[in-house]
Every structure is written in structure tokens, then in C-alpha cells.
């Protein structure tokens, strides 16, 4: 028997499957089942299904094992020397443990972003498109995988795969429910995310990001986060103007690192368990940068580790 408060997130996740089967709202509050709301898309009902149909203890154990293995496999698929892969594992171990203790899908998001990059590097456009679409339809974060579009060798094939997988992910939950129900849940999903964004604004345990830092220090709720996000997007996009660098793997790794950092730094949903995503970016930045590491580089690495810990 597992204490309910210890695996609340997993209870929310498995509830997505059972509520889809029963055609109940995925975004209502069910205080007799778990605390908090679900914030994942309807396709998550199929992702979590294998772990929801078995007893809680077994499902939870398998869920954690699959999350950890997914991250391990994604890193192993990178065109990166084994020693650097091992460094990434050790550097991210603390954040991985934190996310595992909270049963969080953020581990899978990190794996999806890294995996989509690795697939593009290997010329597997269909696989990359699947990962990007799945991550987007589950938790939106996956959409940042489109940042690797300029590195895709066969762009028409990639675009067609994105469209095809989007159709599949949109209609797939209908197999265990109905078209009307699923379409209605997509509408509710948008409304729940909008509400959650407002709830996170001054939350102590949420919005642990650049957006949240500025918001909480200023104490102002009157301005739009776009005032911070748009300049951030502009800075993020500047490296893409270096067209001649696209052919260099070190440059592409720098973009991957930037993507992994950006998705959390500019999200109001950032919390402790999301930091597995940017930590992977920090480790990749340190191990793949083409210049000799300076004392400042080491200091930044240590600062990030200590700050998060």
C-alpha cells in the first residue's frame, strides 16, 4: 500500500486514462481521487494506459523505470563520446531523482527534446516528428523541438510527418472514447492551462523561472509576460543568423542546450521537478562547447548545481 500523498501525481496521471474511458472531464477536480488538476492533453490517456491498468504499486514502479530508461536511451542516441554521456548522467542525477520522486513526466519531456535532436542528426525525420508531436500533444513543451527544423536534411518529409503524426495524436484518444468527447476535452485543456497560468503568477512553488523572478521581484501583475518572452525569443533566434555554422555539430549542440534552457526559463509552469530539462542543457553546453573551459565556465557549472540543490 502506498501513502496517497506520496504518489499524487501518478494518481492524476492514471486518472486521465480511466476518466477518458468513462468520458468524464479530464480537467475537473476530483478530491476523492487526488489533489490538484490534470494539465496534460487527451493523448496522455494512451501514454499512461499500460501503467493505469495494473495495481498502483506495480504501475508506479514501471512508470518510474520507463521514465529513467527513456532519459538514458535518449542520451545514448546522441552522437556524443561515452565519457561525455556519463558526465551528463552524473550531473543530472540529482534532478532526475527529484523528478522521479514526484513521478513527473518532465523526465520524458527532456528525453523527447534530446531524442528528437538525435533522430534529426541521424536523418530519421519521421521519428523526430513523432517525438515532437507527442511531446506537444501531451504537455506543449515538446513543440520546442521545432527549433531543430533548420538542421533537418529532408524538410518536406519532416513536414509531412509532422502533419501525419498530428492527425494521429489528435484522433487516437477517440479509440477509447468518442470524437465529441475528445474535441470537448481539447477545449477544456486550453481553458485549464489558461487558468493554471494565472494561478502560477505569484505561486511560491511554481513559476520558478526568469518570468517568475521578474514578476515576483517587481510584485506587479499589470504587465504581460510577452514583454519578457519576446526579447527572449529574439535573443534565442540570433544564433540562427550564423548560417555557416549549421554544418558544425558543436553549433547544433549549442542550439540543443539553448532549447533545453529556454523551455523552463520562459515558462510559468516551471517548478523544481522541471529542472531535469535545463540541467541536461547545462551539461551538454559544458561538454560540447568547442572552446577550452575557463575558470568562469567551471564556476557557472558549479553555481547552477549548487543553486538547484
Positions of the model-derived regions?
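The feature captures the transmembrane alpha-helix scaffold of multi-pass secondary transporters
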Residues: 126-130, 299-302
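Interfacial segments of multi-pass membrane proteins
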Residues: 150, 154, 284-285
